[in-house]
């Protein structure tokens, strides 16, 4: 994968996160801001989730209240380099824990 392909895939991932949050109709108030390739999700309880891209390694990183994760693009999905878990599944779990309301990223 070259840098251009990486950025296109990372942009697509972040757009999917934005679209899901924009369409979320639950009671939890989740705000997000994207600045310089870094997306920050802010929750009512003051906790945050940070998603950023690491261009030199062609990875997407996820920082949650529960820990940090690094994802590589494999077979059409972003996969955690330690656990093998899918990015969207880990993000949904973290958002659910930090917002107190079930959130799905399909």
From Swiss-Prot:
Pfam families, A to Z: Frataxin_Cyay
Any one GO MF annotation of this record: ferrous iron binding
Sequence intervals crossing the membrane: none
Entry's Gene Ontology cellular component terms: cytosol
Gene3D superfamilies: Frataxin/CyaY
Organism superkingdom: Bacteria
Key words of the record: Iron, Metal-binding
Listed GO biological process terms: iron-sulfur cluster assembly
HAMAP family given in the database record: CyaY
Family from the record: Belongs to the frataxin family.
PANTHER family listed in its UniProt record: FRATAXIN (PTHR16821), FRATAXIN, MITOCHONDRIAL (PTHR16821:SF2)
Role: Involved in iron-sulfur (Fe-S) cluster assembly. May act as a regulator of Fe-S biogenesis.
UniProt name for this protein: Iron-sulfur cluster assembly protein CyaY
Organism of derivation: Dickeya chrysanthemi (Pectobacterium chrysanthemi)
Gene name per UniProt: cyaY
